Structures are given as C-alpha cells and as structure tokens.
C-alpha cells in the first residue's frame, strides 16, 4: 500500500515536472517570438522616423572632415572671409567619420549612417533596460517611448553618437553598482575619452550623469546614521536607501575622467569650451539653446509624469527622482537638454515601472509576452507598425522629399554664384541657416552654423560677428560697410513664411544694391557704390 502510494506520488511529481518544463519551454519560445517581433517593429518605426533631409551642421561637418584629413588640426578657421579666426574643432573625430562616409556613399551614405546609429542606440537601450529591470514587456514599452522621444534629435550630427555613449555610461554605472566588476570602470574612462574627441560640447554632461548616484549615496549615509525620526522613517519607507560601497570607486573614476580632456589634439579646449559657450551670446539666438516648448515633447512629459506618479505608490530608488528632477530643470532652461532627459530618464522610467509591479505583486510580464506572441497579435502588431511608419514617411516625404531642402538651402543661387562671380574673392553676406551649405561649395561665408566661432569669447575680437548678423536689419549700412560686404545672399521668403523678408524689401528698394539673381526663396544682391559712413565699434 505504501509502495503504491509512493509510486503514485512519484508519477504525480514527474507529471508536474513535465508540465513545468513544458511551460518553461513555451515561455522561452514566446519570449523569442516577442523579442523578434519587437525588434522588427521598432526597426521599421525607427528607419522611417529618421528624416531624409540633411541638417545645416552636416554640410560643414563634411568640409571640416576633409580639411582635417588633408591638413590636420591647426585650430584655425578656413571657411569664412574673416581673417585669422581661431576654431576649436569641437567634434573633429565625428567630422572625419562623416567625411569618410560621404566619400563612400555621398548623401545617401550619410542618411544610412544616421539610421544605423539610431538602430544601434535603440537596440542597446532595449538590451540595457532588460538587464536592469528584468522585465521584457516594460523594456520594450520604454524603448518605444525613447524611440519616439529621441526621433526629433536624430540627424547626421555628433549628438547621435553621444546619445549612444551616454546610454552606455548609465548602463555601466548601473552594472558596476550591481555587481562591482572593475571592467565597467575602465569602460567609463574610455567613454569620457571618446566624448572629448567626438562631441566636446557635451563632455560636461558626462559628469552630470554621476551626480544623482553621489547624491543618493550621501543621503543614504545621513539617513542610516541618524536616529529614527519622522523624516528618516518617511525616507526609509518611500525610498531604497541602502549604502552601496562601490560608489567611492565611481567617484574616483569621475575624477580620473577629468584628465581625459588632455588626451585630444585640441589642447586645453575641453576645459574652456562650455564656459565660453555659456558666456557667448549664441545662447540668445540658437534654437537649441532656447527654453523648451513642452507641447513639442509629449512623450517626455509622459515619462516625467509616470516617474513622479508611480513613486507615490511604491518604494523607488531616490537616484531616479534626483536624475529626473535635475534633468527636467536643465531641459526647462534649454531645448538641447531635452534629449539628455529623454535618454537618461528612460532608465528611471523603466525601473520605476518595474518596481511598481514588483512591489505590488503584479505579475504581468509573462501575461503580456504570451498574448503578444500569439500569431494574430504578431500580425496585427507588424501591420500597425507598417501603417504608422508609412504615414510618417509619407508626411516627411511631402515636406522634404530630397536630401537638400531647396527652400532652406540656396542650391540654384549657389550654382549662379559659382558660374558668374569670382566667388572665392567676394565678401558675401549670407544667412546663418545656409552658411554651411555655401562653405561646402567653397564659397567663403560671413557666418554659418558653427555659431560659437563668431562670438567674441571664441574669436578674440573686440566686436561680435554674431550680434552684427542678428542686428543687420536695424543698421545694415553700418554693418555692411564695416565688413566691406560686396554681395548679399539672403532669404527672399523665410521657410514656412508667406510674406517677403524685411531685409529683401529693404535692399530691393535701395538703389545702391543691384539684384543679380532671385528665385522663389532666395535673392542675390551686389553693392554698386560705397556710402560715406564712419564706422566705430566700442
């Protein structure tokens, strides 16, 4: 009787083990289907989100990359007609990279490189978020939010590479705090070195990302050493305040990273660039330095709201709140910081989401995976993604069907100048937005989107070229006389505007300027005589 009962129990256990093993195999299979489906869908979406039309910085990037390979880095400007302006080459390594791609594949190659870099960023985010949260569905959803949030910043600029580097930085910090492996510290040093050479302007943000971790460590030390009171009890209840001794190694690495600024061909520029930029007046004029318009960043708003809202109902890591709060304050002051908020903030977004489900015993990951791995779900998901991507591409194609937007960049006017004028010896006043396109075509410019080059802080001049450009319609005769301008290429109509530009009307009505060329968007004038104006700059 006992043997029979024991045998039955063994059979029952074997059946349970077989059932459990079968469920595990099914779950493993469903996870593979989920991952493959997600990767396909997010890839389709990302590819169609990348704008085909090139941005103005790309043009000077190509030209500077060529200059570096041919002549090296001499810390001088070679493309404006202003004499002996110093130039910092803030993303020299990326310039070389883009020029080499341009040599191989032209504008198409550059467009493809932007897609590839964006895909690398997205794939890595998905991988990193899964490693940190251990929730596949939350990682996928968070990656989707990040893709939409960052898509507006994806273009052939050095920032696209720096996005990948910052994502790596957050991941390496998290992994080091989790398992203490020293290899992550070496990777962090390497990231600092690469940023110094590939996108110098954002190097200070490398150090900013460390700050929430240090703040959490200091607060944890204080709370754990103090006697319990209302404040400490509240903090212990609401936040995970375990003291991680690995933080001291992170602090050491951050200090060592400061010296990576010496390992560049740019001399001491890494230590002065941000200070000079903040002191310069380009902050007043450049769009990416302006205050954020929240209506244009809905997915970032969703991310911020979710972190704060869920932190009310679950115990979270306080570094996530420090990170989100600090980056939100930065984003309010400057649009360029919204990308850093979207990038670093997505790690906080995913972790808070995961902690909410864990702390409230909401086991939904497997349920979502099983549902989304069904045949009908996979087909519907792919079809919806294709429809979304097609709609995005159709809209973008209507707005900007080509690599070069002829309403923004004077393609035909440039051809006219090169065919009819001694273009290398004229002193051409031009608009900021298309100066880079002119210098790509070997036409010396008055100004271009290397904005800092033309401020007093960088030029060392006692007058400000950028200020003079912005005030041109107020006192154009004085400005044109001071810079000995012989020709002017300006917008006849600014992109998106229906009215003629004020400066075009002024010059058209002035008999001292001859209209040499015009089309629907641009006009080229030549000055035909000088006026007696005394020029003084205080």
Give the label of every model feature segment.
Residues 362-419, 441, 449-451, 471, ...:
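Membrane-proximal, lumen/periplasm-facing interface regions of secretory-pathway glyco-
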Residues 461-520:
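Periplasmic/luminal catalytic loop of GT-C fold multi-pass membrane glycosyltransferases
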Residues 53-57, 69-71, 82-83, 200-314, ...:
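Transmembrane catalytic cores of multi-pass membrane glycosyltransferases
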Residues 45, 149-150, 184-201, 210, ...:
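Membrane-interface alpha helices of multi-pass inner-membrane proteins
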């Amino acid at each position: 009787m006992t043997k029979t009962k024991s045998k039955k129990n063994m059979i029952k256990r074997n059946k349970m083990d077989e059932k459990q093993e079968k469920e595990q195999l099914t779950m493993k299979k469903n996870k593979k289907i989920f991952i493959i489906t997600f990767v396909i869908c997010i890839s389709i979406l990302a590819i169609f989100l990348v704008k085909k039309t090139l941005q103005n910085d790309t043009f000077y990037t190509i030209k500077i990359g060529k200059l570096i390979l041919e002549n090296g880095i001499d810390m001088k400007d070679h493309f404006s007609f202003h004499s002996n302006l110093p130039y910092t080459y803030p993303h020299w390594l990326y310039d070389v990279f883009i020029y080499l791609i341009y040599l191989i594949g032209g504008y198409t190659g550059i467009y493809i490189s932007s897609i590839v870099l964006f895909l690398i960023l997205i794939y890595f985010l998905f991988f990193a978020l899964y490693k940190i949260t251990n929730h596949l569905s939350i990682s996928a959803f968070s990656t989707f939010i990040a893709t939409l949030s960052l898509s507006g910043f994806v273009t052939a600029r050095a920032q696209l590479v720096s996005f990948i580097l910052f994502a790596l930085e957050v991941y390496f910090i998290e992994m080091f705090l989790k398992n203490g492996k020293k290899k992550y510290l070496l990777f962090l040093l390497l990231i600092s070195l690469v940023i110094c050479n590939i996108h110098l302007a954002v190097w200070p943000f490398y150090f900013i990302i460390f700050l929430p971790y240090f703040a959490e460590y200091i607060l944890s030390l204080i709370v754990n050493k103090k006697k319990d009171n209302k404040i400490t009890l509240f903090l212990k209840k609401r936040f995970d305040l375990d003291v991680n001794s690995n933080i001291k190694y992170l602090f050491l690495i951050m200090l060592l990273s400061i010296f990576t600024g010496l390992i560049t061909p740019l001399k001491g520029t890494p230590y002065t660039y941000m200070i000079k930029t903040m002191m310069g007046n380009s902050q007043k004029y450049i769009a990416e330095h302006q205050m954020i318009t929240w209506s244009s960043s809905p997915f970032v708003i969703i991310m911020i709201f979710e972190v704060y809202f869920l932190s009310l109902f679950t115990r979270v890591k306080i570094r996530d709140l420090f990170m989100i709060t600090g980056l939100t304050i930065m984003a309010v002051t400057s649009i360029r910081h919204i990308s850093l908020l979207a990038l670093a903030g997505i790690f906080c977004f995913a972790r808070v989401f995961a902690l909410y489900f864990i702390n409230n015993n909401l086991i939904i990951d497997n349920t979502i995976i099983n549902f989304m791995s069904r045949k009908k779900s996979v087909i519907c998901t792919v079809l919806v993604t294709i429809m979304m991507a097609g709609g995005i591409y159709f809209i973008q194609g209507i707005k900007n069907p080509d690599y070069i937007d002829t309403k923004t960049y004077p393609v035909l006017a440039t051809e006219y100048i090169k065919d009819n004028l001694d273009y290398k010896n004229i002193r051409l006043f031009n608009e900021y937005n298309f100066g880079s396109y002119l210098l790509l075509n070997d036409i010396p410019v008055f100004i271009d989107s290397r904005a800092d080059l033309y401020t007093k802080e960088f030029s060392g001049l006692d007058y400000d070229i950028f200020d003079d450009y912005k005030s041109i319609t107020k006192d154009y005769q004085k400005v044109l006389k001071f810079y000995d301008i012989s020709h002017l290429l300006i917008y006849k109509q600014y992109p998106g505007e229906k009215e003629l530009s004020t400066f075009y009307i002024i010059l058209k009505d002035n008999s001292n300027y001859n209209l040499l060329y015009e089309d629907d968007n641009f006009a080229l004038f030549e000055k035909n005589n000088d006026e007696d104006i005394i020029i003084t700059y205080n």
